């Protein structure tokens, strides 16, 4: 019985027709952007002995958050003691920043016609901000809030201003940092860490507990700003003193939900 087969002598196959295939039979050149980047990261790590330096621009490009984390792991982001590669990468992704330590992060600033590279450092203030609020390192300005209540209050004001036709604080390159409550010194320490890296910083705290002597003054002298209430009062005190009864009833009803 005759069969329809290719004539090997009449078919021209060039170099471009030969490609590596994966386990599922898909040509590797047909992989998506994210899969291709993961493959390249693995190859780069395997060749680290002869090519120990890697350059990655916009590391988050084409990668979902979970794959971005895997990509950074492949490049040795968690192997701080003995990294397999020396990697220079740029990013605008808070997911990528959260996976790094402060010792791996450098902030680049244009200054007087040239650029200054500042190491973020490994202080507790830098590391805790990286884990909880990495967006702060991608912003121009940061409001360091004493706790979650202050963050919510600031966000609410921002939304009200947007509804009134003003530009959003976030659209202007701003971010919020939650200092986690406690002493106001915590907020000043977080703020000072960002201030030293060239960010514009405002600390938003209650006025019921004083900071350590000289802490607030040193922060302001370094270029920081402080927003607080009248002496001895907190956010909750001011709200219950000045909001109308209807608004207070709404707040209490929300708290009971």
Regions inferred by a protein language model and the residue ranges of each:
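Coupling/switch/interface segments within P-loop NTPase motor domains and analogous charged loops
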Residues: 1-5
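Charged, alpha-helix-enriched surfaces in structured cytosolic catalytic cores
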Residues: 66, 70, 91, 148, ...
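A short acidic, amphipathic alpha-helical/loop segment
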Residues: 70, 189-193, 214-218
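RecA-like P-loop NTPase motor core
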Residues: 76-83, 94-202, 207-211, 224
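Non-catalytic substrate-recognition/targeting regions of SAM-dependent transferases
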Residues: 7-9, 13
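Activity-critical C-terminal alpha-helical subdomain
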Residues: 206-257
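Switch/communication elements of ASCE P-loop NTPase nucleotide-binding domains
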Residues: 14-136
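A short acidic, often aromatic-flanked loop/helix-cap motif at beta-alpha or helix-coil junctions
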Residues: 11, 113-115, 182-186, 230-238
């Amino acid at each position: 019985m005759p069969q329809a087969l290719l004539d090997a002598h009449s078919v021209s196959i060039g170099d471009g027709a030969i490609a590596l295939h994966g386990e599922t039979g898909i040509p590797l050149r047909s992989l998506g952007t994210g899969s291709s980047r993961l493959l390249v990261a693995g190859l780069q790590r395997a060749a680290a002995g002869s090519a120990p330096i890697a350059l990655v621009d916009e590391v988050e490009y084409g990668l979902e958050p979970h794959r971005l984390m895997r990509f950074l792991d492949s490049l040795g982001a968690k192997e701080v003691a003995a990294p397999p590669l020396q990697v220079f990468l740029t990013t605008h992704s808070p997911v990528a920043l959260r996976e790094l330590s402060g010792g791996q992060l450098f902030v680049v600033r244009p200054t007087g016609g040239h650029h200054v590279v500042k190491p973020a450092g490994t202080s507790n203030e830098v590391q805790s901000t990286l884990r909880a609020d990495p967006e702060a390192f991608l912003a121009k300005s940061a409001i360091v809030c004493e706790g979650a209540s202050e963050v919510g209050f600031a966000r609410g004001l921002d939304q009200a201003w947007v509804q009134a036709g003003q530009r959003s604080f976030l659209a202007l390159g701003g971010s919020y940092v939650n200092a986690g409550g406690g002493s106001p010194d915590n907020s000043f320490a977080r703020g000072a860490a960002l201030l030293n890296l060239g960010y514009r910083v405002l600390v938003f705290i209650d006025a019921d507990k004083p900071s350590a002597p000289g802490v607030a003054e040193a922060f302001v002298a370094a270029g920081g700003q402080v927003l607080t209430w009248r002496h001895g009062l907190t956010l909750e005190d001011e709200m219950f003193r000045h909001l109308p009864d209807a608004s207070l009833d709404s707040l209490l009803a929300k708290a009971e939900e």
